[in-house]
C-alpha cells in the first residue's frame, strides 16, 4: 500500500490527507485518488439533493400542473412520475454517439438536459402524493426520505415504521410523535435518542425502558418520573394529570423536560452496538470512519445518512442504502446495489455503473440518464458487451486527456463527481444550504 499522502485540493487550494487504507480502496475499485477534500466532496453531492421541497410546475410533456421536486425554473425537462415510469416513452430515443473531440462532461450535460427527469423520487408507493424520496411505503403526507413505512405525517428519514408524526430519524418504531433519533420504540412522545422502549414521554438517551416520563440515561427501568422511581399507581395518576393531549400542557412538559435534561452530561457520540467507529449517530456499525447517521454499516469512510440498512465497503456515499456494497462518491442510490461510482438517484437493483442519473434495474451503464432494465449503454446508446468493455476505458482516458473546466476554473477528469454547475436545483433549495448556508447575495 502507498504511504500517507498530503494533497492540495483544487477547490480551496488547501491540504487534505489520503491514508494508506484510502489508496487501497481506490485501487480496489480502480479510480484515481480524489483531488477534492472529503468536506467538498460531500458538498458537491449535496448540491444535487433536495429533501423537503415540492413545487407546482407544468409537466414538460403536456403542460399539466404537477407536483415536483424540481421547481419551474429548473433547466431540466420533468415528466410526472407515473408517466415517467410507464412504457409510453423510451429514454433510449435520446441516445447519442460518443464524441472524442469534446469533453465527456460537456456531452453528458447535453444528454441530461434532453432526457426528462421524474417529478419525484418515489418507488412502489401508495397514497404518497405529498411526499418524496420514498420507497415501498403507504399513506405519507408531507414526509420525506422514508422506506417501508405506513401512515406517516410531517416526518423525515423514517424506516420500517408505522404511525409516525412530526419526527426525524425514526427506525423500526410505531406510534411515535415528536421524536428525534429513536429506534424500536412504541408509543413514544417527545423522545430523543431512545431505543427498545415502550410508553415513554419526553425521555432522552433511554434504552429498554417502559412507562417513563422526562427521564435521562436510564437503562431497563419502568415507572420513573424525571429519573425518580415511583409505583405503577403513582405513575398512572401522574400521566392522567399531565394531560399531554393539551397543546399548552404539552409545551409546558416539553420545556420542563428539556430543562431537566440539561442537568446531565452529554455522551461524546450517539449510537449503540458499534465496533471501531468514529463519527456520530452510528448504530450497529463496524469499522466505520468519519461517518454520520449510519445504520448497519461496515467498512465505510466519509459516509452520511445511510439510515436504511446494510451498507458495506464504500466511500463518500451520501443518502440511502438498503443493501449497498462498493459504492463510491454517489448519492441517493440504494436497494440492492453494488459497484456504483459517481451516480445519482440510481435505484433499485443497479450495479457496475458510472456517471448514471435516475437509472433503475440496470447494470454496466456509463454516462446514462433515465434508463431502466438496460445494460451495456453509453450516453443512452446500446452496445454489445464487447463493444462496451472496449469503449469505456477509452472514454476514461479521454476524460483525462480532455478534461472539463467549469466556470470557476475547476478541472473535472475521470474520478470526479459531476460538475457542481450541472445541478438542476437552485442552491437555496438543496441540502447544501442546510449545512453550508449562504445568504441571498452570496
Predicted regions and their residues:
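Long, distal/terminal scaffolding or interaction modules
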Residues: 2-442
